[in-house]
């Protein structure tokens, strides 16, 4: 009986072990928002990365912008890891902005990439940029809070007032899988 209990305990301990390596918070680049564009036959990613030191001070940007390119989204992400020197973390991403050119060519591959990533959450808001997503994401906002949070609050306000219907990753994926339903996304433009 004692041997069975010890064996059961060992099996239980094996179940609690994870298959992913441990990454400390200071080794991660926490992406708050990402803009994807298609330029010169490659993807151009603009990422707003959270910077805790900037968030503690008077800097209302709360982060830094990282711009990378690649033939595929995966290659651009690998380039972002190399350029940033930290592991890119999607778990707290609140906003994806897709450039107008990618939207015209089809968003299926972009949505499939974020759906396949284990860190991406299904409730990420998705917008189409009127022009380039990197420009929309880089636009400074007159705000005392983080720009991505300000944009998210604007989306919620417009939805509450019936001015737009928010599109999130899970809803878009469902619409793309169903041939009887069309996906709809709000367009972001600054004037």
Model regions and ranges:
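Membrane-proximal alpha-helical signals and transmembrane carboxylates
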Residues: 2-191
């Amino acid at each position: 009986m004692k041997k069975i209990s010890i064996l059961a305990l060992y099996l239980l301990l094996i179940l609690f072990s994870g298959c992913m390596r441990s990454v400390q918070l200071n080794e991660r680049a926490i992406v708050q928002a990402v803009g994807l564009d298609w330029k010169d036959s490659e993807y151009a990613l603009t990422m707003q990365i959270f910077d805790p030191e900037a968030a503690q001070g008077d800097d209302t940007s709360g982060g830094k912008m990282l711009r990378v390119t690649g033939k595929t989204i995966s290659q651009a992400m690998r380039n972002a890891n190399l350029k940033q020197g930290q592991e890119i973390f999607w778990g707290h991403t609140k906003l994806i902005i897709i450039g107008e050119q990618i939207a015209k060519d089809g968003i299926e591959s972009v949505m499939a990439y974020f759906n396949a990533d284990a860190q991406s959450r299904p409730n990420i808001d998705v917008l189409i940029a009127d022009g380039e997503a990197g420009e929309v994401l880089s636009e400074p906002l007159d705000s005392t809070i983080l720009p991505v949070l300000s944009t998210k609050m604007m989306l919620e306000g417009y939805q509450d007032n019936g001015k737009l219907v928010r599109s999130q990753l899970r809803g878009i994926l469902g619409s793309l899988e169903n041939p009887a339903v069309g996906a709809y996304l709000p367009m972001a433009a600054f004037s």
